[in-house]
Amino acid sequence: MIVMQLQQQLLIWVIFWLNYATALTNFTWSSDSPSMVYALRAQRDVMSSATIDQLPLVGVDVGRVFINGMVIENKDEDEEDEDLLVMLESLLEAGVQALSVDVEYKDEIWVVGNSTIAFDDFLLTVRDFLDGTNTDLSANILMVMLRIQPNSSDYGSPSTFNNYTHGYNYSDISDYNKDDIGDASDIEALIYSNIGRSYIYSPEDLVDDRNKSYTSDIYGLNSVNGWPTLSHFLYQKRKRVLFTELTTEMPYNTSSLLFNKTILHLDGGNIAISCPTSNSELTELSLVAWRFIENEFTDDSVRSYVDCGYSPIIANKYNQNNITHLLNLTQSALLWSWEVGQPSTNEKKNSDTLEAYNCVSFVYTANNYSAYWKVENCYDEKKGLCEAKTDLFSYIVSENVDSYFNFDSFDGSNCPDGFDFSIPKTPLEQLAVINYLRLRNSSDTEIWIDLNSISVNNCWVTGGPYATCPYETVMSRRNFTKMITPASITSFGLLVLVTCLNLLSLPIHDNRSNWRRMINKLSRNEFDGVPA
């Protein structure tokens, strides 16, 4: 299963190239390395214990990126819309996790702003992506932010809208009033009918999670004002997408499918930010949920925003001549953890030394205060990263060096009391480690972090060297021995028995002359023919 899923995801970048090549002229694109698939999955799994409001979600403004100025030559209107939607789905498959979309009412249907793309076609594209990635191996969170044009709140007619929604049953949502058909509330009906309730995390779901103590604050404590972890969102609730309205055109209540704009913090334009340089500043920023910045970015600036704890919404204007730059921009933002080209377990092996390139180190560069993750030999001896059990954003580096296998094992840990062997789970936590090293004037260094693929190659897990891969069943040698021993003993016993029977004659055959004499004696008592 893991191999099949990997093969599908490795085609993402090639598909992206083919989709654009079909739609645009003078286009060239090289596919990304397979390590990108492993890197994004490992990064998602590391963040699984973080609450969803603290995740770095890289997004795009659909109107500015795909609609404005995009004219596909030799295509009619319908073909152009179809190509744009294919590009959008490919971008989602490449790792984009947030979409900002303008919605307006035009020609008696709801459409994506400044386009002829029907809003339900946009939603069906999102649904296709959700269906295609709805496995534990590929699933991830998606945020869709809607801007409903203010002049679009009172259009339409019941008959027109009923035809447009393809038979949507309003009785499925109790708070809809049929007399209101044609206003902005219709958008919620479209979302319900085209996405499906099972994928959507709604305000009602949040209330339920808070009532059941499934939500946490930034300290990891149960909170009625918190959000669920990514793990709970994806694997317990089995949800995939949140919808939020950035305008105020729709009525809001806890039975709605959409969150209102008060749940998030969205800045636009050239916003000057400064990265937190202390634990108190990191804590203060963490108290702001869903931190988005919508702007035109460069490769360097978009990565800077992510490293400082923000989620960028890319609003660069593209056309058919420069749209290929978008992938480079998204790649710069998506991967806040790994070095480019990592993780790689294909290091050259030396038969004279013990080598196992399945463990990850935190590589710090002092001259620019940057860091990334890199796969190293598990037998190398390094210091390790230790996180305080109670204090937020509090990290230290161990005094002792050891191999990865022995750094934190059943025999004990090299981390001091009150600290656990750990790994940065978000960009802000990574920034906290960088600040710790910077304030101590640390030189370039490499330290072990709690991430490895020892059990299954390229399945990156936390929890020390004995952690197992959640996507593939792995049997240890000890369990395998316990399972195979009874069967082996039984088989050996049967083999011995069969061998003995083949080698030893039956007792009655030991004296063949006596056997023949007995047969002759019995034959005398037999009559020939029929007795008179």
Curated annotation (Swiss-Prot):
Q: Where are the transmembrane segments?
A: 488-508
Disulphide linkage map = none
Membrane-topology annotation of the record? Single-pass type I membrane protein
Q: Which residues lie on this side of the membrane: Cytoplasmic?
A: 509-532
- A GO CC term attached to the entry: endoplasmic reticulum membrane
Instruction: Tell me one GO biological process term.
Output: cellular response to hydrostatic pressure
May I ask which residue range the UniProt record assigns to the signal sequence?
1-23
Q: Which keywords has UniProt assigned to this entry?
A: Glycoprotein, Membrane, Signal, Transmembrane, Transmembrane helix
State where the protein is found. Answer: Membrane
Question: Topological domain, Extracellular: which ranges?
Answer: 24-487
A Pfam family reported for this protein in Swiss-Prot or TrEMBL: TIM-barrel_MTC6
Q: Which residues are glycosylated?
A: N26, N114, N151, N163, N169, N211, N253, N260, N322, N328, N368, N441, N479
The family note in this entry says: Belongs to the MTC6 family.
The record's function comment reads: May be involved in telomere capping.
**Entry protein name:** Maintenance of telomere capping protein 6
The gene that this protein is the product of is MTC6
